[in-house]
Amino acid sequence: MQEFLIPAKPDLQAARESWLKMLARERRLSPETVEAYERDTRQFLHFLTGHCGGSPGISDIANLRPADLRGFLAARRNAGAGARTLGRGLAGIRSLLRFLERRGLVNAAGAAALRAPRQPKSLPKPLTASDAKQVVSVEGQLAEEPWIAARNAAVLTLLYGSGLRISEALGLAGADLASETDTVLRVTGKGGKTRLVPVLPVALRAIAEYRRLCPYHLDPKGLLFRGARGGPLNPAIIQRDMAKLRSALNLPDTATPHALRHSFATHLLGRGGDLRTIQELLGHASLSTTQIYTGVDTARLLEIYESAHPRA
């Protein structure tokens, strides 16, 4: 239980709690990211307790030097944390310090000057086009209820057909894609940023079939995708069903819902999509994030989206 105690003085505890709420409500970070930042900063406060000789408060945070942060990263590295985990931890600490700085409580310049650990380059692991088609087809779904099979197919088709994150797909409203003529979708992604993505006819048909079979009233202002009891659809349900599909289709463990988004980008690039367009479709803030897909598939066949996508 000691791991979950927050070793900080009341002023810092309250400020940290306000920061975490801000990340979820205003920055609209995913619950998984907020949870990771909570865990990383909790570990940082545990480190400072030993480093400072007692529970730290805002005054202790204000007096932090880059050497203190380097000491924390070194301790985490010695405990077995990899570069990616260390980088995320530093990002969380920087975010907290910037939050405190905006309130006039600390100076975050020291943390900003600290270089993040070098991240290893790892290539995304997309599905093959044929495997992706099997995964998103309603015939391939394993759910016994027809409307749930149609729902799962519609969600997975949006991940592969439009490159959505699972949180973006499950955040769609009932009014979104209400007609098969709605070929463009406005998506709100990370950090509240919006982008326009094209929607393939196969995705529109999948959504229309889900609407037809869904036993619940889909209020235009409510969520489009519903759980078995009519509430919001939990991402874990899609991930669980994807795991069942993975087993049934004999796919690798890397075949996850997010791998469909990787497949979207990789297959477009391999069939002629340009990096700038794919960057915009994925909602990447930096082109360097998108450039990782150039190492996955270099075959170039067609030039435009409709003819590029295997589901077009």
UniProtKB/Swiss-Prot annotation:
The active site is at 165, 190, 258, 261, 284, 293 (o-(3'-phospho-dna)-tyrosine intermediate). Belongs to the 'phage' integrase family. XerC subfamily. One of its GO terms (biological process) is chromosome segregation. The lineage of its organism: Bacteria, Pseudomonadati, Pseudomonadota, Alphaproteobacteria, Hyphomicrobiales. Keywords: Cell cycle, Cell division, Chromosome partition, Cytoplasm, DNA integration, DNA recombination, DNA-binding. Disulfide bonds: none annotated. GO terms for cellular component: cytoplasm. This is Tyrosine recombinase XerC. Site-specific tyrosine recombinase, which acts by catalyzing the cutting and rejoining of the recombining DNA molecules. The XerC-XerD complex is essential to convert dimers of the bacterial chromosome into monomers to permit their segregation at cell division. It also contributes to the segregational stability of plasmids. Residues 122-306 form the Tyr recombinase domain. Forms a cyclic heterotetrameric complex composed of two molecules of XerC and two molecules of XerD. Pfam families: Phage_int_SAM_1, Phage_integrase. InterPro entries: CB, DNA_brk_join_enz, Integrase-like_cat_sf, Integrase_catalytic, Integrase_recombinase_N, Integrase_SAM-like_N, Tyrosine_recombinase_XerC/XerD, Tyrosine_recombinase_XerCD. The keyword Ion transport does not apply. It comes from the Bacteria.
